[in-house]
């Protein structure tokens, strides 16, 4: 359940915190040097193709009388009429008025008006946003805008690339056909007129379409070779799982602007992965789970493996490794000298299958037999649930010159059924560092393998369970540091993230087999997916960290001896930055992501001070929208629960009035190591709820979440949901006591892990604080989720049966104490299986619990997108929430006949007078 910070509105979707991609295979088809990446990142993120989406006008806050035609003028009796007639007219008018009043009152009840009403006047107001520093009056944010990506900042991705002779500051740009060419390499200095010493611009591909023989090819993704003479091109793209895909691959020649199939003998063979050798003379690729080598000097493809298939994967991860370990589609790593290829061999033969049904589409690609067209398509996924057999994964090597596959037995290795390989890193020419954990991810071993002598040894052991009772998060950010005696580095080494005094910090290990590090960072703060880059010439390590506050991200540098730590970004005010360095670290793309309007700039880091070379994005259109629309204000604060300081943000409606009573919606994710409260500029569904519906929206990152230290993070281990729900309830009770909060209208919602947390909070609270909840794609029993993720935080069910019982949603009587709750799920969710929601419904049925609504989305996976589902799920969330806070679910829970108006009035009266 990989959670990426770059996902569209996707803080709702996955379950684990974001992990960086490995730098060890930058020229593979898992890298970022792709046409699609560049094109998408040079436009507005997340723009959906469904421009026809046009929700009907929202009547929720329309006063009844505002929509009615004016009544006729009152009847004026003739003076010639008698007194009796006048009396009849008088009583008739009186009865007519009374009937009109009764009708208006009935309509008032039917409309479900509550004691709180956000009027159109109020929605035009706006107060200063404490996070963005802007003030505006304007229109409310609309749901259509949020879902269409209108509020997402415009962002440019730069694909840095090293020059053929090590030149720094080169980038790959992709654009439209014509002009400067479709795919081109530019020296960053040439972008602003400084041509001194630059390569200037060279065109790699003039057009996005080209011919291979008689066939016209439309480019989808590209990967230039390291020498920039060839381009690996992907066409006919087909998505597989979250990160993986297949397609047809072509080798495009830059000089002739012509192309040939990657495998001339099998041009239509769908390839899962392709990766350039470091010296540009060969491509290793995976097809049908087997590995092949294509040397450019030959038209023939050499098979590396032959027994790959349904249960045996070579060079690519299976479902669970792709989702929970590598966060990508590659399990292949070239050595720096191109003599060897390291790759994973994954044996799934003992892993049970889970069937995912599709009722409207056929993603398997199999054409049904005649007469069987009305049966659903079924994909059988090898999916290891908690406690079930895991795939057996081994590291193997291919000697390119000898055409030989071999493996290396290493002393002290984990047993086959207890091994998870989380990172492979080439160190110098023949040495490989391998980071592996046990099945429960609480023992870490680092192995050093010499592929020349075919020997290996364990060089580091970390007993995490003995250290703090926690776990190891998989990451691929370890950085090799080659020896350079002239620069004061007599031996090879590497930089890794380690636990130091309860926080994640950078450590430098040298030589490679030395288990005692030089600490580069220390303190009560944490590094984030570090290091970002290393300047080997000057001995500088660049990284992003939370040094100023858990909700912020700033860029820092430190010497390899741990001295002279200083920021590169302005730490005098809150900020959230991302940085991407050029290959030689002399240049970087600095992305300011909030709290004010995001911007991007190219910076030069060669000198003692950062120099801004060029601003490439300032988001002027977004700035204009902020001035036009009523943006909710954000109030950031800390809350201390059981001695732990936790981060919280309150989104207040425009023109917030502390003398009014507001409903409150809690939004949470809450997964281990995740973060939802941050200082990024964000206009999302929560912003819509505050701006348009006029509710307060609160988010608390409780215990278990990231960047607040290991003690607060690891306390949840073995008992997911307990402390997290306790923290949400405690915060909600605090809000219920505020003078401007309507404690009778409090709701909570979340997606994925947040869906689980919604149900767990409602279960633990039993209607004492929250009255409503909305859970999307929730886990309801951790025995149903995948083994690698679940056992990292819960141990195995065999080891911790009581913990699994406690973490499951089992107390139906407690759920019945809530006024009402909503559960929604994609019917074809390959991640959090529909089994979770169906099992919960069965428990509710057995307990005769009926105070819930449920909705399923056919053929939708975990993100719920199929056939307009993404719009529908948020529309349903919005409408359901309005009905909840307008008291509609109270009326549904206690219906009366229409002629019992007095009883209905008495029952509804408390809602209106509150």
Swiss-Prot record:
The UniProt record lists the EC number as 3.4.14.5
User: Which segments cross the bilayer?
Assistant: 90-110
Q: Which residues form the active site?
A: 752 (charge relay system), 829 (charge relay system), 862 (charge relay system)
Q: Which residues are glycosylated?
A: 347, 638, 806
GO biological process entries = proteolysis
Keyword Protease listed: yes
Name one cellular component (GO) term.
Answer: plasma membrane
- Comp. bias intervals (Low complexity): 20-34
- Return the annotated region ranges for Disordered: 1-81
Judged by the first EC level, this protein's enzyme class is hydrolase
The answer to whether the entry has keyword Kinase is no
The reaction(s) annotated as catalysed by this protein in its Swiss-Prot or TrEMBL entry are: Release of an N-terminal dipeptide, Xaa-Yaa-|-Zaa-, from a polypeptide, preferentially when Yaa is Pro, provided Zaa is neither Pro nor hydroxyproline
Any ranges marked Vacuolar in the topology annotation, and which?
A: 111-914
Membrane association type: Single-pass type II membrane protein
In its UniProt record, a GO molecular function of this protein is: aminopeptidase activity
For this UniProt record, give its keywords in alphabetical order, as a comma-separated list: Aminopeptidase, Glycoprotein, Hydrolase, Membrane, Protease, Serine protease, Signal-anchor, Transmembrane, Transmembrane helix, Vacuole
Cite the ranges annotated as topological domain Cytoplasmic.
1-89
Localization per Swiss-Prot or TrEMBL: Vacuole membrane
Compositionally biased tracts (Acidic residues): 1-10
Family membership noted in the UniProt record: Belongs to the peptidase S9B family.
Functional summary from the UniProt entry: Type IV dipeptidyl-peptidase which removes N-terminal dipeptides sequentially from polypeptides having unsubstituted N-termini provided that the penultimate residue is proline.
**What name has this protein been given in UniProt?**
Probable dipeptidyl-aminopeptidase B
């Amino acid at each position: 359940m990989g959670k990426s910070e770059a996902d569209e509105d996707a803080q709702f979707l996955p379950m684990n915190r974001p992990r960086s991609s490995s730098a060890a295979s930058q020229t593979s088809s898992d890298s970022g040097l792709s046409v699609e990446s560049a094109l998408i990142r040079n436009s507005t993120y997340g723009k959906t193709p469904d421009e026809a989406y046009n929700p009907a006008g929202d009547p929720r806050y329309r006063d009844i009388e505002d929509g009615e035609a004016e009544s006729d003028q009152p009847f004026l009796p003739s003076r010639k009429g008698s007194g009796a007639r006048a009396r009849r007219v008088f009583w008739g008018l009186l009865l007519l008025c009374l009937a009109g009043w009764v009708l208006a009152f009935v309509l008032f009840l039917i409309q479900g008006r509550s004691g709180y009403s956000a009027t159109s006047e109020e929605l035009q107001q706006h107060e200063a946003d404490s996070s963005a520093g802007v003030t505006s009056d304007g229109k409310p944010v609309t749901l259509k805008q949020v879902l269409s990506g209108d509020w997402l900042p415009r962002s440019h991705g730069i694909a840095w690339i090293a020059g053929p002779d090590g030149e720094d500051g080169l980038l790959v740009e992709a654009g439209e056909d014509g002009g400067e060419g479709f795919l081109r390499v530019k020296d960053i200095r040439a972008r602003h007129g400084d041509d001194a010493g630059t390569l200037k611009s060279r065109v790699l591909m003039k057009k996005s379409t080209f011919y291979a023989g008689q066939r016209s090819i439309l480019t989808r993704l590209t990967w230039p070779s390291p020498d920039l003479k060839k381009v690996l091109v992907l066409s006919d793209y087909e998505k597989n799982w979250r990160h993986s895909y297949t397609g047809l691959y072509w080798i495009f020649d830059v000089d002739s602007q012509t192309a040939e199939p990657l495998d001339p003998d099998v041009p239509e063979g769908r390839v899962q992965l392709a990766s350039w050798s470091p010296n540009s003379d060969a491509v290793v690729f995976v097809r049908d789970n087997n590995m092949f080598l294509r040397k450019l000097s030959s038209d023939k493809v050499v098979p590396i493996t032959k027994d790959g298939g349904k249960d045996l994967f070579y060079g690519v991860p299976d479902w669970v490794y792709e989702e929970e370990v590598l966060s990508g589609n590659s399990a292949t790593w070239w050595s720096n000298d191109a003599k060897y290829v390291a790759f994973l061999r994954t044996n799934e033969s003992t892993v049970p299958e889970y069937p995912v049904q599709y009722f409207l589409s056929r993603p398997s690609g199999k054409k049904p037999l005649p007469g069987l067209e009305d049966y659903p398509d079924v994909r059988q996924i090898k999916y290891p649930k908690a406690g079930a057999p895991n795939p057996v994964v081994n590291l193997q090597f291919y000697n390119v010159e000898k055409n030989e596959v071999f493996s290396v037995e290493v002393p002290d290795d984990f047993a086959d059924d207890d091994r998870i390989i989380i990172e492979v890193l080439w160190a110098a020419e023949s040495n490989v560092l391998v980071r592996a954990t046990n099945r429960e991810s609480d023992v870490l071993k680092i192995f050093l393998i010499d592929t020349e002598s075919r020997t290996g040894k364990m060089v580091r052991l970390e007993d995490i369970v003995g250290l703090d009772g926690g776990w190891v998060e998989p990451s691929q950010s370890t950085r090799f540091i080659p020896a350079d005696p002239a620069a004061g580095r007599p031996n090879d080494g590497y930089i890794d993230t380690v636990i130091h005094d309860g926080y994640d910090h950078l450590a430098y290990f040298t030589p490679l087999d030395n288990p005692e590090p030089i600490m580069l960072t220390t303190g009560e703060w944490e590094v984030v997916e570090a290091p970002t880059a290393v300047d080997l010439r000057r001995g500088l390590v660049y990284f992003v960290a939370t040094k100023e506050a858990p909700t912020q991200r700033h860029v820092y540098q430190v010497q390899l001896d741990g001295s002279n730590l200083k920021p590169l970004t302005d730490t005098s005010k809150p900020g959230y930055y991302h940085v991407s360095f050029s290959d030689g670290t002399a240049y970087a793309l600095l992305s300011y992501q909030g709290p004010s309007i995001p911007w991007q700039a190219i910076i030069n880091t060669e000198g003692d001070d950062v120099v801004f070379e060029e601003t490439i994005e300032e988001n002027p259109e977004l700035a204009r929208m902020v001035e036009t629309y009523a943006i909710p204000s954000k109030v950031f604060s800390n809350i201390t629960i059981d001695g732990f300081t936790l981060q919280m943000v309150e989104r207040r409606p425009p023109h917030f009035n502390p003398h009014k009573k507001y409903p409150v919606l809690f939004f949470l994710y809450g997964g281990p190591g995740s973060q939802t409260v941050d200082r990024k500029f964000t206009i999302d569904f929560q912003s819509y709820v505050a701006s348009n519906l006029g509710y307060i929206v609160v988010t608390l990152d409780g215990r278990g979440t990231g960047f607040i230290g290991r003690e607060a993070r690891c306390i949840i281990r073995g008992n997911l949901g307990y402390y997290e729900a306790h923290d949400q309830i405690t915060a909600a009770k605090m809000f219920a006591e505020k003078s401007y909060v309507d404690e009778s209208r409090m709701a909570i919602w979340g997606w994925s892990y947040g869906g689980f947390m919604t149900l767990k909070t409602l279960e633990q609270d039993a209607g004492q604080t929250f009255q409503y909840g909305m859970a999307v794609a929730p886990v309801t029993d951790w025995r149903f989720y995948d083994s690698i993720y679940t056992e990292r935080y819960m141990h195995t069910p065999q080891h911790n049966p009581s913990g699994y019982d406690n973490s499951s949603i089992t107390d139906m009587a407690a759920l019945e104490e809530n006024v009402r709750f909503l559960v929604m799920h994609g019917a074809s969710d390959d991640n959090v299986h529909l089994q979770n929601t169906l099992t919960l419904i069965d428990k509710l049925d057995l307990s005769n619990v009926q105070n819930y609504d449920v909705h399923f989305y056919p053929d939708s996976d975990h993100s719920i997108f199929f056939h307009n589902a993404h719009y529908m799920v948020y529309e349903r969330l919005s409408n359901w929430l309005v009905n909840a806070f307008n008291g509609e679910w109270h009326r549904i829970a206690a219906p009366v006949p229409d002629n019992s108006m007095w009883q209905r009035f008495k029952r509804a009266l408390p809602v209106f007078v509150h």
